[in-house]
């Protein structure tokens, strides 16, 4: 409809301006224009067809594709319509430029032909003076370019009115009609532009509002999310702190209540136990008093016999325990003797056996403990004693007697001090060590009493030329004879004589043999102490 109205308006305006520019008048009767009317009908029909096709194509895409593919010039018209429909101000700019150019041509034509009209004024039939009404269109909220177009047209109309042109009545009516049509078309265009602008503003406003609402919702959602996260974090921290504080307070209160209840329960249990003990004692006392005159008349005699029996059992138990301790002591001593005399063991450590002997000795000493009184019985066992209290208990006031240490404990102490943390060599190991001292013994036999480094070297060199004496030793006191006698004694396990021979040495030979003397003496001392323990245990 917009294209049709615009095209009609342009045609009418051209006709009116063309008749005005020529200045000719028609006095004869208006001829019929059948061919022109036919062309107008065809043009209007084609315009209506294309306009309807374009409008329906905007509403239906399938019809639009069919219309643009099968109707000539339809695709170009659709592109032009979409071009001006998206930017309606372009059409106003083009229309305004066309009108402005035509107005300039009209004014130039009027000016150029004014003299011709004056010369031919007598031959023209003047019917009416041209007087057009200005375009009274409300342009308060209209497009600025449309305002400019309406203002230019009003200036053109005022110029035509001021020129006082006389035209025939038919042309006057045609121009009047064209003016009315132009007013109507401009009013429609103004309303269309207002509506389009209003729709555009409403659409843009709705889009902006939608976009702002979306941004607001996103910001609101993000803010709510962050706020919720912060609040949850603060609530969790507050909850955790409050839980810890309350748990601590509850634990302290529970602990205090538990202590209070325990103390209260202990007091109640103590009071109840005291009451029960009193009641029990009272019941027992009553029953004893009742039974004492009946079946328990001989209770004291039975009690004395039971005491005698328990004493006999205690004495028997002590005797049995003592015998068992003696057996174990004998076994441990025999074990030590067998380990010391075993030549298959190069060295022996008897710390475990000593600890067992020590334990058995302490146990045996408890069985041999005497009473504190001279007659062998403790005063606490005597009846009718003056120290007897109300409850029948007797406090012994005898001075305690200190028993002298036994030979067994003394021997064990000596054995412990001799062998504690040290190893005892076998006879074969002692003999082998003595053979290892042969070279050093020969070197020491050649050294003077106060030898230096030179004397040491000289003795070492000359000792290489000495021979070790073996065989049946003589009673001589030279070093070779002593070495031979010691070796012979060790070979027959006569360790005592061998140690005496080595101890009798003096000077460097004695100093060379100090370590060997220490090991041999330890072996002799252990043997003697073990023999003492064996004899003492057999006498117990």
UniProtKB/Swiss-Prot annotation:
It is found in: Mitochondrion inner membrane. Pfam families: Mitofilin. Disruption phenotype: Increases frequency of mitochondrial genome loss and leads to altered mitochondrial morphology. Moderately reduces mitochondrial membrane potential and import efficiency of preproteins that are transported into or across the inner membrane via TIM23 complex. Impairs precursor protein import via the MIA pathway. 60-70% of mitochondria exhibit an increased inner membrane surface and stacks of lamellar cristae disconnected from the inner boundary membrane. Residues 173-268 form a coiled coil. Residues 1-17 form a transit peptide. Residues 18-37 are mitochondrial matrix. Residues 58-540 are mitochondrial intermembrane. Its main location: mitochondrion. Keywords: Coiled coil, Membrane, Mitochondrion, Mitochondrion inner membrane, Transit peptide, Transmembrane, Transmembrane helix. The chain crosses the membrane at residues 38-57. GO terms for biological process: cristae formation; protein import into mitochondrial intermembrane space. One of its GO terms (cellular component) is MICOS complex. It is a single-pass membrane protein. It comes from the Eukaryota. Present with 5730 molecules/cell in log phase SD medium. PANTHER family: MICOS COMPLEX SUBUNIT MIC60, MITOFILIN. Component of the MICOS complex, a large protein complex of the mitochondrial inner membrane that plays crucial roles in the maintenance of crista junctions, inner membrane architecture, and formation of contact sites to the outer membrane. Plays a role in keeping cristae membranes connected to the inner boundary membrane. Also promotes protein import via the mitochondrial intermembrane space assembly (MIA) pathway. Belongs to the MICOS complex subunit Mic60 family. This is MICOS complex subunit MIC60. It comes from Saccharomyces cerevisiae (strain ATCC 204508 / S288c) (Baker's yeast).
